[in-house]
Amino acid sequence: MKKNIKKIALAYSGGLDTSIMIPWLKEHYEHAEVIAVICDLGQQEDLDAIKNKALKSGASKAYVVDVKNEFAIQYLWPLVKSGALYEDQYILGTISRPLIAQKLVEIALTEQVNAVAHGATGKGNDQVRFEYSLKALAPQLEIIAPWRAWDIKSRQEAIVYAKAHGIEVPVTPKAPYSRDHNIWYISHEGGVLEDPSQEMPDDVLLMTSPVSQAPDEEEMIILDFKKGVPVALNEQKLSPVALLNSLNQKAGQHGIGVADIVENRLVGMKIRGIYEAPAAAVLYKAHKLLESLCLTRSTLHLKQSLQQTYANLVYEGRWFSQTKQALDAFIDVTQQHVTGRVKLKLFKGNIIPAGMHSPYSLHHPALATFEEDNVYNQKDAEGFINLFSLSAKIYSQVHQGGNYD
């Protein structure tokens, strides 16, 4: 216990983990003032109720910060441009953690607190993501991680503690799903989901229709991109938040964007998670199609080789790093001409290409045609093939006892 800590800023969500933080912090840091910081990431919760809950739990102040637009522009759009997927599957919804940490620091400095606290467990990735960002942004602040300090060892014990302190939580011992929700995705973990051999229960999905219940008619959508960033849906220019919300609704009802995966956590263990990300799935598909039209072969291949590096960086929470800045600089150059329109059909969990166009398209029918043309001289290929395959020919001659004649 640090006796000199008199004021603490807490990253507060109102869920189980952070619901019990306020009384615990006040108990273990005598006379400490707790300030709750709530970020509106589009989680579609009653944030006023969460604010009141924080105050009723003993917080002296509670801030609600609307970061949805900032989240989309400064975090999600760079992610779309990168095309990064962690382990080729995970859509990286926890990219929100550095932004939460940033807002926590801003309020902490304004309020002149001694310490900041978060509700991430000692078994998960979020503790690393939060604390990496906090140390990068405000290394002078003390960091408190109650899950690594208290005697509570399970979610069931946390529920008991909450009830003992009169704190209402949206979780019961029989259905202890741990959910994280923002405008990019919803994640589901815990309970029966911890066993990968068990099929996902029907009560898990919140934003996406089961494929069996999806419409029997396909839906055509049109996405416009400018320099790798989505700017319009169905020929209507929308704000980033409105575009994401609309696309989540459209793609979600068609059963698109559900991932049931086992991922490797940064802290060493494997975890099963169910992720819903309808808009993200569609945007990634459309962006990838447009890149195939607009990027040169060598640029596309180099970018693809760096996507896992970028995904790892985001997954590990290294958003405020020199590496991330360098990768963003490269990606921004690749996106200068990723501008155009992509048409897609949404149908029972499938995203089907239905045409694309770009003023910067590098695809020229006159060159690619299988019909007779006067542009491409096929005889030119012979010299290229001879030079391209020369090393293979020499290797074969040397190791098979051949000669150079």
Curated annotation (Swiss-Prot):
It is an enzyme of class 6 (ligase). Pathway: Amino-acid biosynthesis; L-arginine biosynthesis; L-arginine from L-ornithine and carbamoyl phosphate: step 2/3. Keywords: Amino-acid biosynthesis, Arginine biosynthesis, ATP-binding, Cytoplasm, Ligase, Nucleotide-binding. One of its GO terms (biological process) is argininosuccinate metabolic process. Gene3D superfamilies: Argininosuccinate synthetase, chain A, domain 2, HUPs, Single helix bin. InterPro entries: Arginosuc_syn_C, Arginosuc_syn_N, Arginosuc_synth, Arginosuc_synth_CS, Arginosuc_synth_type_1_subfam, AS_cat/multimer_dom_body, Rossmann-like_a/b/a_fold. ATP binds at A11, Y12, S13, G14, G15, L16, D17, T18, S19, G119. Its EC number is 6.3.4.5. The keyword Ligase applies. GO terms for molecular function: argininosuccinate synthase activity; ATP binding. GO terms for cellular component: cytoplasm. L-aspartate binds at T121, N125, D126. It comes from the Bacteria. L-citrulline binds at Y90, N125, R129, S178, S187, E263, Y275. It catalyses: L-citrulline + L-aspartate + ATP = 2-(N(omega)-L-arginino)succinate + AMP + diphosphate + H(+). It is found in: Cytoplasm. Belongs to the argininosuccinate synthase family. Type 1 subfamily. Homotetramer. PANTHER family: ARGININOSUCCINATE SYNTHASE. This is Argininosuccinate synthase. It comes from Legionella pneumophila (strain Lens). The gene is argG.
